[in-house]
From Swiss-Prot:
Component of the RIX1 complex required for processing of ITS2 sequences from 35S pre-rRNA. Residues 1-11 have a biased composition (Basic residues). Residues 1-27 are annotated as: Disordered. Component of the RIX1 complex, composed of ipi1, rix1/ipi2 and ipi3 in a 1:2:2 stoichiometry. The complex interacts (via rix1) with mdn1 (via its hexameric AAA ATPase ring) and the pre-60S ribosome particles. Belongs to the IPI1/TEX10 family. This is Pre-rRNA-processing protein ipi1. It is found in: Nucleus. Gene3D superfamilies: Leucine-rich Repeat Variant. It comes from the Eukaryota. GO terms for biological process: rRNA processing. It comes from Aspergillus clavatus (strain ATCC 1007 / CBS 513.65 / DSM 816 / NCTC 3887 / NRRL 1 / QM 1276 / 107). It holds the Pfam family Ipi1_N.
Length: 357
């Protein structure tokens, strides 16, 4: 009985509130640890002075690997870190990683579903040195064309923005690489709604079909397409692309005047016309487009290195569809009409110049 009463008393003691007296300190618990002492140093088991912080190159490589993370926020933040590292590096200093190692990881993000990731990716691409990007145009274009023909309207607009940046930094390489001319033009006409069976059967008397095709094109851009902003970006990128591909060279008129003056000074007694046609060709294979002894080839995947070849293909395959589409866009007026005027200007100059001298 005594032991039982003692156990009950001890259990009851745990639930009793101790009465404190005035001026008397509270009793310290049994697991109390005295921290009133002062130490000159604190030693941790895992602390070591020999472990150094990761270098900037190591952090760059780490964030580059995080661009394939499943989290949209992680991918966006990693791209922001990469952009800051490239922009803030000293002038004329090399990149933490070569562009040949950076681009293969970044290219799939052109088709990323997150709008924030694609926006940050474009900022990163603009921070890359243009001279280093020119050698990798052939790797970029397939992803850009896939984005231009994507089902998502926002993704199509982002792909066109990437293409506009690429044409700005490496325009000559874009239009001259394999598939860079015909395939990209097909993507443009597909996105704009100009490359359709109705447009090929269009006649001057069917103005209703033009307005119908314009409304269908506008609807393909989603809610933002009602304001025409995606259409303006598309037309602006198309104007830049055509200017690089078939635009009249700035030195063309100056070169012809200079050649005529030199001929007159040399003492030619007869009028000389089209002198450039009798000179040594500038291209290594001027008659390669005839394909006299070659096997049947894929025109869409070919390289059109000269303006003459690009204009010949454009005039035979795309000129009619582009002119009909521009007429419909010009009829809409507003900002879309002004944007189409830029494309029309480039097209008129190219037609006036023709295949070349």
């Amino acid at each position: 009985m005594g032991s039982s009463a003692k156990k009950k008393k001890e259990k009851k003691k745990d639930f009793q509130k101790t009465k404190l007296r005035v001026g008397k300190t509270k009793a310290k618990p049994e697991n109390f640890t005295d921290t009133s002492f002062k130490a000159k140093s604190i030693v941790l088991n895992q602390q070591s002075l020999h472990i150094s912080a990761p270098s900037a190159d190591a952090q760059f490589t780490h964030h580059l690997s995080l661009t394939s993370s499943k989290s949209d926020t992680q991918r966006r933040d990693s791209l922001a870190h990469l952009t800051t590292s490239i922009v803030s590096r000293p002038v004329d200093s090399p990149l933490p990683q070569p562009v040949s190692a950076i681009l293969p990881t970044l290219l799939p993000l052109i088709l990323d579903a997150s709008n924030g990731v694609r926006t940050q990716l474009l900022k990163l691409l603009r921070a890359l040195p243009p001279a280093d990007v020119q050698d990798h145009v052939a790797q970029l274009l397939p992803y850009i064309r896939a984005g231009m023909t994507h089902l998502a309207a926002d993704l199509r607009v982002s792909a066109v923005e990437v293409l506009a940046w690429l044409v700005d930094v490496a325009g000559a390489e874009v239009v001259a690489c394999a598939g860079g001319w015909i395939k990209t033009l097909n993507c443009f006409l597909s996105v704009l709604g100009w490359h359709t069976e109705e447009s090929s059967k269009w006649s001057s008397s069917s103005s209703a079909s033009v307005s119908a095709s314009a409304s269908a094109t506008r609807a393909s851009f989603g809610k933002a397409g009602a304001q025409g902003k995606p259409m303006i970006k598309m037309l602006g990128a198309l104007a830049e692309f055509l200017q690089v591909g078939i635009g009249r060279p700035a030195e063309a008129a100056i070169g012809l005047d200079a050649s005529d003056a030199e001929a007159g000074v040399a003492g030619w007694e007869f009028p000389l016309r089209h002198a450039a046609q009798h000179m040594v060709p500038r291209s290594s294979a001027p008659y390669i487009h005839l394909n006299l002894f070659g096997q049947p080839r894929d025109e869409e995947g070919e390289m059109y290195e000269t303006r003459e070849d690009r204009y010949r293909v454009f005039a035979s395959r795309f000129l009619g569809a582009v002119q009909r589409g521009l007429e419909g866009a010009r009829g809409e007026g507003g900002e879309v009409g002004r944007a189409s005027a830029g494309v029309s200007k480039v097209l008129k100059e190219a037609i006036a110049y023709g295949p070349g001298p």
